[in-house]
């Protein structure tokens, strides 16, 4: 699932910058 999240990261940021901020901390912790 982590792989899918990382691939969708760029799409989320481009679609919703607000969501990217929320996912940023989550990604940093997951990585």
Swiss-Prot record:
Where would I find the 2'-cysteinyl-6'-hydroxytryptophan sulfoxide (Trp-Cys) crosslink on this chain? 12-16
Which family does the similarity line name?
Answer: Belongs to the MSDIN fungal toxin family.
InterPro entries assigned to the protein according to its UniProt record, in alphabetical order: Amanitin/phalloidin
Provide the function of this protein.
Major toxin that belongs to the bicyclic heptapeptides called phallotoxins. Although structurally related to amatoxins, phallotoxins have a different mode of action, which is the stabilization of F-actin. Phallotoxins are poisonous when administered parenterally, but not orally because of poor absorption.
UniProt name for this protein: Phalloidin proprotein
Question: Crosslink Cyclopeptide (Ala-Pro) sits at which residues?
Answer: 11-17
GO terms assigned for molecular function? toxin activity
Propeptide regions on this chain: 1-10, 18-31
Organism per entry: Amanita ocreata
**Alphabetically ordered keywords of this record:** Thioether bond, Toxin
Q: How is it modified after translation?
A: Processed by the macrocyclase-peptidase enzyme POPB to yield a toxic cyclic heptapeptide. POPB first removes 10 residues from the N-terminus. Conformational trapping of the remaining peptide forces the enzyme to release this intermediate rather than proceed to macrocyclization. The enzyme rebinds the remaining peptide in a different conformation and catalyzes macrocyclization of the N-terminal 7 residues.
């Amino acid at each position: 699932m982590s792989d899918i999240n990382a691939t969708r990261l760029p799409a989320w940021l481009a679609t919703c910058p607000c969501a990217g901020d929320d996912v940023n901390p989550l990604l940093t912790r997951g990585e």
